[in-house]
A protein has these predicted regions:
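Juxtamembrane "helix-exit" motif on the non-cytosolic side of transmembrane helices
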Residues: 28-30, 99-100, 125-132, 210-221
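Transmembrane alpha-helix segments characteristic
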Residues: 14-25, 68-71, 192-219
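Transmembrane helices and adjacent periplasmic/lumenal helix-loop junctions
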Residues: 28, 36, 67-96, 118-126
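Membrane-interface helix-loop-helix junctions at transmembrane boundaries of multi-pass membrane enzymes
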Residues: 9-17, 58-64, 99-112, 184-203
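Membrane-embedded helix bundles of polyisoprenyl
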Residues: 1-55, 65-76
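Membrane-lumen/periplasm interface segments of specific transmembrane helices
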Residues: 96-97, 107-187, 202, 206-207
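Hydrophobic/aromatic-rich transmembrane helices and adjacent perimembrane loops
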Residues: 38-44, 79, 85-86, 222-247
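Alpha-helical transmembrane segments of multipass membrane proteins
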Residues: 41, 76, 80, 120-124, ...
Length: 255
C-alpha cells in the first residue's frame, strides 16, 4: 500500500491529504488494514489513473511520473486478472487521448514505454501455459463454452440479468456516495478535464464488470453476492479521489 500512498502526499496539501486518508479508510476499511488484494488493486488503479492524467492531460513532462506508472502497471497486471483489464483500459485511454489531441507521434516514446509494461504478465502467462499452471475459476469458462451463441443470447439479452446487476450496484452505499461526490464536485468546480477523464475510466471498468457478470457460467445471484462488494471498490475509490482532486484544484486556484 505504501508506494502509491506516499505519492498522495505530493498530490495534496496536509489538510486535503488527511481528507483523502479519511476517504480511503471509509472506502477500503478492513481491506486497507488487513491488506486484501482488492484494496491494493483499487489504490494502484486510482493512482495509475491520476499519473496518466498528469502526464497526458496536464502535460507533465516528468520521467519520474512515467517510470512510476510503468511500475504500477506491472504490479497491477500481476496482482489479479482485474488488474490486467485495468491496465488495458488505461492504455486504451492513453491512445484515445493522444489520437484525439493529435499528440500521438509527439508522445510515441512514452506510449511505447508504457506498452512494454505488459511484457511481464505476457511472460508469466506463457510460463503458466508451458508448465500447465491453471486457474480452475477461469477454466470453467472454457468448459462451459461461454462464447457459444446460445449461451451469450440467453445471458446478454436477458433483461433480468441487467436488473439484478444494477440492483447490486445501487445497493453498495459507498459506490453511490462516490458518484454523488464526484457529481457535486463537478457542479461546484466545473473542472471538465478531471471529471470526464475519471468518468470515462470508471465507466469503462464498470462496463467490463457487467460483461463479465453477464457471461459468468456460475449462478448470477451468487456471483454478484460474492464479488460486487470487492470489485466495486476500485471505481468507488477512483471517483472519490478525482472528486476530491477537483475540489483541491479549485481551492488552490482561489488561493
Amino acid at each position: 500500500f505504501f508506494p502509491p500512498l506516499i505519492l498522495s502526499i505530493k498530490t495534496f496539501n496536509t489538510r486535503y491529504h488527511l481528507l483523502f486518508l479519511i476517504l480511503l479508510l471509509f472506502i477500503l476499511n478492513l481491506q486497507l488494514i488487513i491488506g486484501i488484494v482488492d484494496g491494493l488493486v483499487a489504490i494502484y488503479f486510482t493512482f495509475s489513473s491520476y499519473l496518466i492524467y498528469e502526464i497526458f492531460v496536464n502535460k507533465q513532462n516528468s520521467f519520474y511520473y512515467l517510470f512510476i506508472v510503468f511500475c504500477f502497471f506491472i504490479i497491477l497486471s500481476l496482482l489479479k486478472h482485474e488488474g490486467i483489464v485495468m491496465v488495458l483500459i488505461l492504455l486504451s485511454i492513453i491512445f484515445i487521448i493522444n489520437i484525439s489531441k493529435k499528440r500521438f507521434f509527439k508522445n510515441h516514446k512514452k506510449i511505447i514505454f508504457l506498452l512494454s509494461s505488459i511484457i511481464p504478465i505476457i511472460i508469466w502467462k506463457i510460463i503458466c501455459i508451458n508448465y500447465n499452471i491453471k486457474n480452475p475459476h477461469l477454466n470453467i469458462f472454457v468448459d462451459q463454452n461461454i462464447f457459444s451463441y446460445i449461451f451469450l443470447k440467453n445471458m446478454i439479452f436477458n433483461f433480468n440479468s441487467y436488473e439484478l446487476i444494477f440492483k447490486f450496484f445501487i445497493l453498495d452505499t459507498r459506490f453511490i456516495l462516490s458518484i454523488i461526490f464526484l457529481l457535486i464536485a463537478f457542479y461546484f468546480t466545473k473542472n471538465k478535464k478531471v471529471f470526464y477523464f475519471s468518468l470515462s475510466i470508471g465507466m469503462a471498468y464498470i462496463f467490463s464488470l457487467v460483461i463479465v457478470f453477464l457471461i459468468t457460467p456460475y449462478d448470477l445471484t451468487w456471483t454478484l453476492e460474492t464479488t460486487v462488494s470487492r470489485v466495486i471498490t476500485s471505481p468507488t475509490l477512483l471517483f472519490s479521489f478525482f472528486g476530491l482532486l477537483q475540489i483541491y484544484n479549485k481551492m488552490v486556484k482561489v488561493q
